[in-house]
Each structure stands twice: as C-alpha cells, then as structure tokens.
Amino acid sequence: MGAVPSTPRWGGSSSAARPLDTAEYLISTFIGDESFPISSDFWHKLLELPLNLQWPPHRVHDACQSLARNNYHTRHLAKILIHMAWCLQESISTSSGAPSLVYVKAVNAVYISSVFLKYFIENEKGDKIEDLYLSLDESEPIPTDITKDLNIEEFVMRSVLSFIGSIDVSPDTYLLHLELLNFMLIAMSTQLLSGPSPGPEDVNPFIDAAMSQESSLVILVVRKLLLSYITGPSISLNSASYSIYSEGSQPGVLQRVSSAAANLMLLPFNFLVSSSGEGSRSLLADCSLHVLLILSHYRKCVVGNEPITDISNDTTASDSLLKGSTHFSDNPYCKALEHATDVEFDRVDTEGNAHAGPVLRIPFASLFDALGMYLADEAAALLLYSLLQGNADFLEYVLVRTDLDTLLMPILEALYNAPKRSSNQIYMLLIILLILSQDSSFNASIHKLIVPSVPWYKERLLHQTSLGSLMVITLIRTVQYNLSKLRDVYLHTTCLATLANMAPHVHRLSAYASQRLVSLFDMLSRKYNKLAEMRDNQMQLVKGNSIEGNGLADDTSTEMHIYTDFLRLVLEILNAILTYALPRNPEVIYAIMHRQEVFQPFRNHPRFNELLENIYTVLDFFNSRMDAHNVDGEWSVEKVLQVIIINCRSWRGEGMKMFTQLRFTYEQESHPEEFFIPYLWQLVLSR
C-alpha cells in the first residue's frame, strides 16, 4: 500500500520504495486518512516493531497535525487507546516469566498514545475535549469482546490502573511502568484547560474515569505508587528505551491555553513523554509521586440536590447561587491516603480497631525515612503535608518517633535557604512545622534532641545545639527574610504561631536563640516606629485636605495594626516562656536583661502594657538580685549567668499575671484545590 495523500512527505532517498512494515511507514499510515478497522492486522504490525526513529521536533509536530486532521474520520486515537488497554490486560495475564512480545506491544502502544494525546490536549480549542473523538464510528465492525457503547477512557484507565496496581516493578517491567505514569500525567493534564477552581462545566475524561474505579483497585494503585516512591527503583534504560524525538527534544509547547491555572504558572506545557531523562533520584519514583499527588488532590465539581459536604464558605452573592447547588464528589485516592495504616501496627491490631472495607497498609517507617531523605524536593514536602494534615495515624506515628531530626533537619535547611526556594515550598514547610507544633510532646522532645553541628548554617558555628533551639533560630531568620523580601503577612503569622505553640515547652534555649528572640522584638519595633512616624506625617497632609494623604494614612494605619499584632505575639511568646518555663531558660532571662531597653518605649502602650508588666516583674526580680551581689570589676557574661541560674531556683512567679496559653492550630482553607492544582502542575511541568 502506497503512502496516502494526506501523509506528510518525510523526505529521504527511496521513500517511494519504502517497505510496508517499517516503523516509518506504519507511523505514516497511522496518521493518514485511511481508517483501519480496530481488528485489522495493521495494529499488530504497528505495535510489534521497535520504534527507534529519530525524528526532529518539526516532523513529530507535523505527524501530530496530520492525525488531528484525520482523526474524526479514522478514529485512530481511540483505536490505539483500545489496543493499549488490550495489551495491558494481556500483559497482566502473562506477567510471569521473561518479557514477551506483549510487553513490547504494550510499551509501543502507551508511548504512541502519549505522544499524540499530548498534542491533542495542548491544542484543544476551548474545552472541547470531545474533539479527541474517544469513540468508534457507528459503521465500525466491533469485535465480540467489546460493546458498541464502550466508554473508552473508562476502559483505558481501568487497564492502566490495573497494571500499575497488580504488576510489580522489575527490570522487565520498569519501562512499561514508567511509560504508563507518563501517559497518566498527560491524560490528566486536561485540568490545565480549566481554571484553578474546578467548575461543573469542566471536562476531564481520563482523571474522572480514574475516580470511578472500585475502592479495592484504588488502594492497590495508591499502595504501588507509594512503594515506588519509597524504594525509588532506578534501572538503566539505555538499549531498552527509545524516543522518536531526536536528542530527547519536544514537539512543541502549549500554544494556547485559556486557563487560569496555566497562566498562573507561566510555564510552557513542555512535559517530557520521552523515556530518557533523569529525576532527582529515580525517574519512576518522581513520576509515581506526581501521579499520586494529582490523583489525591483532584476535585470533581458536580451539580446535585444531595446534601453539600464540601463547598465554599464564601458569602459573596456571585458565588452563592452557583455553589449553593454544586459540591465536590468524594475522591477515593484522597480517602485511601487519609485512612492508610502502618503495616507494623496492623499486625498487632486489635479486633475492635478493625476498619470496615479494604484499607491501605504501608510501611510508615520506610515512608518516614524516604520523606526525610528527599524533603528538599517540593513534591515530597507536599506528600508529607498531605499525610500530616489528613492522616491522623501517620501524624501520630511521626510524633512518637525519637529521631524527629530526620524530618526537621531538611525542613530547617530548606527554610534557611529560602532565597533559593519557591514561596509555595516555604509555605508548605512552615505549615508542616505548625501542624507538628500543635502537639505538646513534640514541643518538649525537640529540646531533648541535640544536634552535634549544623554545617549549612553559615552565620555562626552551631555546636551541640538542641533541635528546638535550631528551630527557633530558623523560624526567626525566616521572619527576618520575609520582612525584607517577601513581606507576606501569612508567612509572618505562621512562623510566629509556631513559635507561640513551642514557647511553654521551651527547655534550655540556647544563648543564640534567646538573643534572636529578643532581637526579633527589636526589629519589629523599629519597623513599627517607622510606620508610626510615617502615619504622623501623613496625618499632617490630611489636615491640609489632601485626598492622597488621607489614602496613604489609611494604608499606613492598616500596616501599623498588623505590626502591632506581631509585636504583641512576640511578647506573648516571651511571656509564655517566662510563665511556664523560666527556671529552665536562664539564657532567655539573660537576653531580656541584656536588651531590656528595647521594651521601655512600649511600656505604656495599651496593647502591650499587661504583657510588659510580667516582663518587668522578671527584670525587677533579677536586677535586684544582681544589685545585691558585689562584684569586683565588670560583670562578665559568665558571672551574670551564674547569678541568674542561682536565683532561678528561688523564683516563685510572684506578681506574674497568668494569661491564657496561646495555642494555634492549622485549618486548611475551604478551597485548597485553588492552591494545590496549579502548584502540582507547576511541579510536574518544571521537572
């Protein structure tokens, strides 16, 4: 059979005499305008040949355009997807022994499907996913093993997920697993055609099909994805891999996306479908994690009259009519992750704690270690957040670990290097610390863990520092960085809330951490005083009937109010230490005494005076004890500390006012998907 008229002319010598069974000819025929029945022998020839072509990007792009022109008539995209599902089903049934021809066919089918599906999704006009034509023509002869009304995306996703969930990763199956994960990411990328907040009109056929699978299959898939992430299998692909792109290049970028999500990310849709490439540690582990996160954070907005359990708390009139009749359907992957239990715990589980239905069981210890090892990766931080925020069993497991430094040290190092990190990653890490700080045993235990050295901390040498002191130092440093660069109120609040949770449980805070805590108050007070001066100057403009001055004064007053809250929160932190942990923290007392002048200007401030009364009660007590000691020569740091330590024993807290102990808890926003969906795709596309 000669080349069909619409087939691109690929060039090269002897093109007219090209054999009918070459990969180049078969691909050209696949994208042409002649429709081959789904039962035609053509499909077996196409899938049985190794696709070792090295096409430049423009040829791949031309091929995709050709299939797009002809697909309405040929339905070849739907047919290759059906053959892919058949190959996967056959691969599952013949999974034992050496890899057979069926594996070659499956890999080829997945890879070809990925290349062309990616182009179709990239170039969708509006939200017309139906232009994929995921159905067979009514005149198509249908084999007996499929029905006329076959839902192709459902059929395909069930086959893909069944293979991932039931077949172990091995040298023989590694490549197919990797290509399937790439295929899933491409198939689920229809999310990028919608806004960041899912609506009832959004069409995501493949990810919706994944959501409709039985819970038993969902649990198998989540377990395998987690295990692939934990073990990080890395197998050399060399001769086993192939690419129809020259030098691993791409056929193009996302040229048109009417998507708030994509616009927010400002990134090209240049996801690599090629098998060649390197991840941060294991390409399969990275892909597994990305697929798991996208599946578990997906939200399907549906219209219905049933009780609404997960809608916005927004009160705006524009949203109330829409969201009053819509809700998010349950996400089975999110549920599986939230109800996952430890395999070790399950062995000794009592009869009364048995869960109804299938439950995901994973090795928490291995997962804990893997997360600690790779927390520098943003996706790993997202997984840790998802588990701590949603899975009470995993949170409890983390809190009882005696080696919390496994998780905390990489988190603190990432925060230390905040200028090199994305703001989203900083938020995630700070929220993780806030969640952990809600537990009093965590706050107590971090001060018992001693870190021999902190090589990444450059400002000064930190030797034999408690993990708690290092956490205080790093959080304060993050506030200082935010104050000078990001100026994000939410970041400030999260840092200070974590410090406030820690404060009553502080034990032997280091000298440097104590100094930084008092310096934090000084830094915020200087910013407050500068704002107060600006406000006074602007008020003079207001008196001169300046409209501009009135607006500036309002802005400055708002900012002053924010800094008033920050200053009060720092005073609350100091108060909590002095009220509940003074005898155990002589360095904090020394730092306050050493810089006591920074508190004086605020002593009569109506928002601060009660809190400062306690600080001055402590100062008066220890200043009087210092005055009672006759010291020859000047006071040294050691001598002052010695007096403080001695008098800590006689401290009874007389005259101290008791304030309600601060306790901040993290509450996920009502529409977390508006943050997570764009963020997750940003990570996938930038890998």
Regions of interest found by a model, annotated:
Residues G2-V110, F120-K125, L641-R687:
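N-terminal alpha-helical scaffolding segments that mark the starts
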Residues K420-R687:
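Eukaryotic scaffolding regions of large macromolecular assemblies
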Residues A3-P5, S35, L81, I92-S95, ...:
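Long alpha-helical rod scaffolds of large eukaryotic non-enzymatic complex subunits
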Residues Y25, H76, H83, N108-V115, ...:
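Acidic, Ser/Thr-rich intrinsically disordered and amphipathic helical segments
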Residues I31, S35-I38, H44-L51, D62-C64, ...:
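Alpha-helical repeat/alpha-solenoid scaffolds of the HEAT/ARM/MIF4G superfamily
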Residues L77-G97, R158-S166, A260-S274, L408-L415, ...:
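Short amphipathic alpha-helical segments and their helix-coil junctions
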